[in-house]
């Protein structure tokens, strides 16, 4: 897992830091306490992604659209199939299990990517080393 260059970002993280990062981001939305807890539970195996370089094609993502502040919700998610950099920003092309295609703008959503099994093992080991 450490030989994979894509995992280098995890060397500075552990499960507690990832959880705190998600909590801080969600707290900024000023959600009711029950919604905040619900989202934290639903995003248990996910990491917040704000950099295009941290996204993985083929990875499963969930997002919270920020366009309408009165309607904040967590999507069911989709598989990231393509990343396009345009004059309008970074566009993420996704496909869900019903084969429906989505295109979302990275800067108009909070994006969370599901951790792979390899990443989970690496984080577990880093947690153990930090104790």
What feature does the model see in each segment?
Residues 68-88:
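Short beta-strand-centered aromatic/proline hotspots
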Residues 1-28:
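Extended boundary segments
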Residues 81-101:
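Basic/aromatic-rich interaction segments and small domains that mediate binding to polyanionic partners
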Residues 57-60, 77, 89-90:
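Short, surface-exposed beta-edge/turn micro-motifs
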Residues 21-57:
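Mixed-charge, Lys/Arg-rich low-complexity intrinsically disordered regions
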Residues 52-70:
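Short coil-to-beta transition motif at edge beta-strands of beta-rich domains
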Residues 1-7, 97-131:
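Intrinsically disordered, low-complexity, charged/polar segments
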